[in-house]
Amino acid sequence: MEPVLTQNRVLTVPNMLSVIRLALIPAFVYVVLSAHANGWGVAILVFSGVSDWADGKIARLLNQSSRLGALLDPAVDRLYMVTVPIVFGLSGIVPWWFVLTLLTRDALLAGTLPLLWSRGLSALPVTYVGKAATFGFMVGFPTILLGQCDPLWSHVLLACGWAFLIWGMYAYLWAFVLYAVQMTMVVRQMPKLKGRAHRPAAQNAGERG
């Protein structure tokens, strides 16, 4: 019975980190768009990126994996992947074609969820290409924002930041192609659930392409 209790826990270190990251999203919007305090924006992005990497490690190390965490962590990740590009677009830091490319990819990905749910799945396994894309964005976005703060190093920071962002974008799109191939195999090989389709258990929600 002990693993069940662990799965149902709410007050865990990883969950608290996810809640903090969630609370920092409106703070990030404010400091960049209203306060024009890009330094604080960089700090929020760095903290969010490091804590996102750390919460999974902590969950395994302290045996604090939970159903809430499996839902909350990827949900917060998606909110960041929507919010940050839009904020950068509104600030004129990145062009809108870049923002729309990322948002269109995520919208297409979200459109496949009903197909997964109808077959008892919540998501497909994350790929190394997807992880590489996430790393590129985690480094690229704060580096470009930091380039807005320091005129002395702006050329170097912007060049490095854009290198990571372009790399991340291509990896992000390639991960979607791999996801589409996986989705095609799932649709062809797995029959729909009989009776009323339902969302699967939350423990698989952390797996995303």
Swiss-Prot record:
Transmembrane portions of the chain: 27-47, 82-102, 126-146, 157-177
Keywords, alphabetical: Cell membrane, Lipid biosynthesis, Lipid metabolism, Membrane, Phospholipid biosynthesis, Phospholipid metabolism, Transferase, Transmembrane, Transmembrane helix
Main location as per UniProt: membrane
Known catalytic reactions: a CDP-1,2-diacyl-sn-glycerol + a 1,2-diacyl-sn-glycero-3-phospho-(1'-sn-glycerol) = a cardiolipin + CMP + H(+); 1,2-dihexadecanoyl-sn-glycero-3-CDP + myo-inositol = 1,2-dihexadecanoyl-sn-glycero-3-phospho-(1D-myo-inositol) + CMP + H(+)
Pathway per the UniProt entry: Lipid metabolism; phospholipid metabolism
Membrane disposition: Multi-pass membrane protein
Disulfide-bonded cysteines: none
Domain of life (superkingdom): Bacteria
EC numbers for this chain: 2.7.8.41
GO annotations of cellular component type: plasma membrane
Cellular localisation: Cell membrane
GO biological process: glycerophospholipid biosynthetic process; phospholipid biosynthetic process
Gene3D superfamilies cross-referenced by the UniProt entry: 1.20.120.1760
Record's keyword annotation contains Lipid metabolism: yes
Top enzyme class: transferase
Similarity comment text for this entry: Belongs to the CDP-alcohol phosphatidyltransferase class-I family.
Function: May catalyze the biosynthesis of cardiolipin from phosphatidylglycerol (PG) and CDP-diacylglycerol. May also catalyze the synthesis of phosphatidylinositol.
Name recorded for this polypeptide: Putative cardiolipin synthase
Species annotation: Mycobacterium tuberculosis (strain ATCC 25618 / H37Rv)
Lineage per the UniProt record: Bacteria, Bacillati, Actinomycetota, Actinomycetes, Mycobacteriales
Protein's gene: pgsA2
